[in-house]
């Protein structure tokens, strides 16, 4: 195993605790135990197969491994993404247990080393880490309508999250 080198300017920014660092996280962050979620391609394929069995989609309508492509195909046929959102394990996303990476990122934010964590994931593991750690003063932005809540310490769900009630906003699709 090779040694890793953290650049001195990054170490300095962490040590200063002035929120000079932002993380952008996504694919793979929630694979580790105890979160244990799959990559979106796996959920997309599973949802595609269910939607195919239910007569919503057919082979050739989209790339089954691309969740945005599946969302676009469902929307084109039904003018809604509801059937796709219902085919995803939404409750698993809502109750996702944070892993060591989530906990460390939120702890660094609570200590002032990180100002923003932007995630492309739907799961709530980062927000659940706030609760698990008892970290206060961290805002959550779940969508564009929440940008007024942006604060010195903020988690931003770039594609919304599992608590989004409007199913047609839940998954990004090309316009």
What are these language model-derived features?
Residues 1-175:
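Conserved catalytic-core helix/loop/strand module for nucleotide-ribose chemistry
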């Amino acid at each position: 195993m090779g040694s890793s080198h953290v650049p001195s300017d990054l170490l300095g920014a962490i040590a200063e605790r002035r929120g000079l660092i932002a993380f952008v996280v996504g694919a793979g962050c929630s694979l580790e135990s105890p979160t244990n979620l799959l990559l979106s391609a796996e959920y997309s394929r599973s949802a595609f197969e269910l939607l195919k069995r239910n007569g919503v989609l057919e082979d050739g309508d989209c790339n089954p491994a691309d969740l945005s492509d599946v969302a676009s195909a469902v929307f084109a046929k039904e003018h809604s993404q509801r059937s796709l959102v219902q085919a995803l394990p939404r409750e698993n996303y809502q109750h996702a247990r944070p892993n060591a990476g989530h906990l460390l990122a939120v702890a660094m934010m609570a200590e002032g080393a990180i100002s923003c964590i932007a995630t492309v994931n739907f799961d709530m593991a980062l927000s659940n880490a706030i609760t698990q750690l008892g970290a206060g003063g961290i805002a959550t932005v779940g969508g564009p309508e929440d940008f007024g809540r942006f604060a010195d310490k903020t988690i931003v769900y770039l594609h919304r999250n599992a608590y989004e009630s409007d199913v047609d906003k839940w998954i990004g699709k090309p316009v």
